[in-house]
Amino acid sequence: MNHQKSTTSGDDETDYFDAIHVDLFTAKILSKLPVKSIAQCRCVSKLWSSQIRRPYYNMLFPIMSPAPPRILFTIENAEGLFFYTSPQPRNPDENTSLVATLHHRTSGNSLLITSPPVGGLLCLEHDRKNYSRVLVISNPITGEFLALPKLRINEIKKELLYLNETYIFGYDPIDKQSKDAERHQWSKHIYQLPNRYLNKVVAAGVVGSSEIVFYRKYTREQDQFFIAYYNLESNIITRVILEVPLLFSGTCCVNAFTNYVGDVRLM
């Protein structure tokens, strides 16, 4: 910090200090807030918004106490697409119960989840009324949506002919080194689930190194919402009740993903 002096007409010396960098104070405040509060702080001022917009924000000013990974749920029915997250415990027992948090919802039922979240973002496929498809990147925490560039006419015609095309959502970190995946050693294990679970659940992902989380793909308003933890070491399935604020009715299509960490940066 530079120290400057100025002499007034009364020969009294007054000390003047250069203004302390405001962005450092802003970053200090933001670093103590939870992820969702940081997202809301983008509306405080242009300065605060520009801080969070920085590509290197998470590295320059990491959150002091980042929230642990959560389970991300999307629930879709005729009323829209709902985005929830819930705690992600390890080694739960039969007495464990979770409460899901609703973050936001979208109207309509023309959005399709194409792949697991990457960098806190989801890739959705939007089917338009003219039978064309548009890929949309969504932030489940902040509620932001970003439509990717439209396809050209010949590409749209190709999609109409080959409806089984698959979109893959990837993330390219800036100035990061990636390891060669071919050098990893893989092993194959076969586990047999109890018959009552075989055709009723799908995998959401792995928690830790030995627990797979399952959920029901389709559920109804009157059904009890639950997830199942399958311990690979003990071969035991633990059913965990999940309390979901129901803002919808009828049959719903569910997607779930483990190890979700939200991101507050603008897209």
Curated annotation (Swiss-Prot):
InterPro entries of this UniProt entry? F-box-like_dom_sf, F-box_dom
Pfam families in the cross-refs: F-box
- All copies of the F-box domain together span 15-63
Q: Which PANTHER family match?
A: BNAA05G37150D PROTEIN-RELATED, E3 UBIQUITIN-PROTEIN LIGASE SGIP1
Provide the protein name: Putative F-box protein At1g61060
